Amino acid sequence: MPTISLENVTKYYKANKHSRAGRTVEIGVEEVNLTIEQGDFVFVTGSSGAGKSTLLGLISGQLKPDRGTVYLDGKDLSKLLRWNYNRTALMFGKVSPEYALIRKLTVEENLSLAARVGRGKFESNREMHARIQKVLGLVGMTGVEKKHPVEMSIGECRRVELARALINSPPILILDEITASLDDDNIWDIFHLLTEINHKGSTVIMATHASQYVNIMRRRVVTIVDGKIFGDVRQGRYGDVM
């Protein structure tokens, strides 16, 4: 299982017309130093625009730092992606607004599409479809294979998005606001699912606004303020308080 390290990582964005006078760039994150060990469960918290999504994008290799380096098991992530994109990209399972389910495809078709990204991962269609059944069962969504996203609730869609992220058995889950717009029951259901997945060895890195739940979960909490890490606290384990 891989370790992720960020060393002096900075990411800029081109400033828009509403930026302060004279500013040509906006800071996404600045001088970030962070290590995430295998099997960690990390909440990334902060206000809207603080840099949470940028941090997750850098960790997964979706974004390239302007300064500093992101390492995966001691190797430069950007170089790993250049040398073997498919193999490296499959280390990460992602859920974010940018990776919403494709509305015109069924649940099965959405998951099949994600599975085919991992060329060579499945030796046959039968093996791939067995994996689809397994991950849907894992997230409590057995029997929805032929449904389209518009036929499901937001909570059900999030579960399917999580199943899609798990389809290629990635060791690292990157989750950007997976609980957004969900009610309390659905939020707790997602947290319970993620706890089970984490207990099986997966690293879980989750950006969220739901700070009231984060404190109860008693996991590692990284807080970002204006693109900088303001706090990094290990609170214990969820099972300790249940």
Per-segment meaning from a language model:
Residues 60:
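Helix-to-loop junction immediately C-terminal to a conserved catalytic motif
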Residues 76, 125-144:
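Conserved ABC ATPase "signature" region
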Residues 77-93, 125, 199:
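ABC ATPase NBD coupling module
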Residues 148-152, 156:
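Conserved ABC ATPase signature
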Residues 162:
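Hydrophobic anchor residue at the start of the ABC signature
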Residues 169:
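Conserved catalytic motifs of ABC-family nucleotide-binding domains
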Residues 173-176:
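Catalytic Walker B motif of ABC-type/P-loop ATPase nucleotide-binding domains
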